[in-house]
Amino acid sequence: MTEPHIIVNDLTMAFGSFVLQRDLTFNVNRGDIFIIMGGSGCGKSTLLRHLIGLQQPAKGKVRYGDVSLWDAGPEERDRIMRGCGILYQSSALWSSMTLAENIAIPLEEYTDLSSAEIREIASLKLALVGLAGFEDYYPSEISGGMKKRAGLARAMALDPGILFFDEPSAGLDPISSHLLDNLILELRDSLGATVVIVTHELASIFAIGNNSVFLDADSKTMIASGDPKQLRAESKNHTVRSFLTRGLEDAPAEEGKAPGPDLCGTSQKEETKQKGEKL
């Protein structure tokens, strides 16, 4: 039985009077590698910002278990966020600090560990992502793929239960991207973490994703959710099929009828709940 880790209900994202996405309702289950996908400018990274507490919804709820992120007090929100690790698109490493010093930042902020203990943890995290021996290297001295892995090591510093990635494959060659995909799978399986990824890289989506939501810029809402591979095979939504097949295979909706959201891999009970649940 699946257990929801993050519950998004009736979420509307807006900048002032401009609505970017509305009425988003979906669950990220524990152990998922959950893909946020859709065309350019549809609001993927903005949704990620809502999930990690950097942007407040215009309407709706983001819940971690039984706790509503934006209704919680500062201490409760801080507790939730300490359970999250984030890898930004640019890796966001401090260029003036070594890799070990970068990883030490959250440990120094949120723990009472000694310098020696922090150094040991930094070395362990770097070894976990294949960077053993690179503690004293600066970001400028390593490749783009290694920077991504170092950023991932820092994201794991506090042993989070959920990891967020914003376009992790951006700027990587196909081999480095494939290696990063394998690393994400290994970490999910070995650490039992939930993973949420913003990406439009189809190879990564199909290689590691088991659940997803598809955002549409034109209708300004989600038009599909579920296993990406199942959506590619079964979706009747033209936009979804075109995206997932690079436009090589079309499946037009019924003539004169706007396509509704595809809910592949979702039980009837869950679908009913997604459509009707209000907090």
Language model: regions and residue ranges:
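Conserved ABC transporter NBD signature motif
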Residues: G60-D71
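Conserved ABC ATPase "signature" region
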Residues: S115-G133
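Helix-to-loop junction immediately C-terminal to a conserved catalytic motif
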Residues: I52
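Catalytic Walker B motif of ABC-type/P-loop ATPase nucleotide-binding domains
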Residues: L163-D166
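Conserved ABC ATPase signature
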Residues: Y138-I142, M146
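A short, proline-enriched helix->beta-strand linker immediately N-terminal to the Walker B motif
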Residues: A157-G161
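Conserved beta-strand-loop-alpha-helix hinge in the C-terminal portion
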Residues: D218-L244
